[in-house]
From Swiss-Prot:
This is Antibacterial protein LC3. The keyword Membrane does not apply. On a 2D-GEL the determined pI of this protein is: 9.12. It comes from Bacillus subtilis. Signal peptide: none annotated. One of its GO terms (cellular component) is extracellular region. It comes from the Bacteria. Antibacterial activity against X.campestris, especially strain G, and P.solacearum PO1. GO terms for biological process: defense response to bacterium.
Length: 28
């Protein structure tokens, strides 16, 4: 859940800085 998920979500996460910060930290 930290490899394929980050890759797929990383696409839309890059667009949303707000969500990125929050989601990136969780997956990272």
């Amino acid at each position: 859940a930290s490899g394929g998920t980050v890759g797929x979500y990383g696409a839309w996460m890059r667009s949303x800085s707000l969500v990125s910060x929050s989601t990136i930290t969780t997956f990272s």
